[in-house]
Amino acid sequence: VTYSLHPGAEQDIADALDFYSERAGQLVAQRFLDEFERVAKLLVAHPELGTPSTKGRRLFPLRVFPYSVVYRSLETGIRIIVVRHQHRKPNYGGARL
């Protein structure tokens, strides 16, 4: 059981890493990535943890950073569709499948 990333989610993560790297340094960017990986592994193990949303999706917040992971449960694991900032564009990534 594992997770896969929508190409848009890959870009969301890259954008967040660029932002934190430029504004706060590599250490903070690495902490963001570590926190994302922690949440992704947690959701693979317990896909029911996220708050139910639309289109069969679930949302789960990162603990330290103002981002939420939007994902869908699959038989083989989870598909991460969006990594969305919690204070910007509440419908961001909504059209992704």
Model region roles, listed by residue range:
Residues 57-59, 68-69:
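Short hydrophobic/aromatic beta-strand element in the GNAT-like acyltransferase core
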Residues 63-65:
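A short, glycine/Asx- and small/polar-enriched loop/turn
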Residues 1-57, 74-77, 96-97:
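Basic, Lys/Arg-enriched alpha-helical interface segments
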Residues 26, 68, 72-97:
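Enriched for short, Lys/Arg-rich terminal
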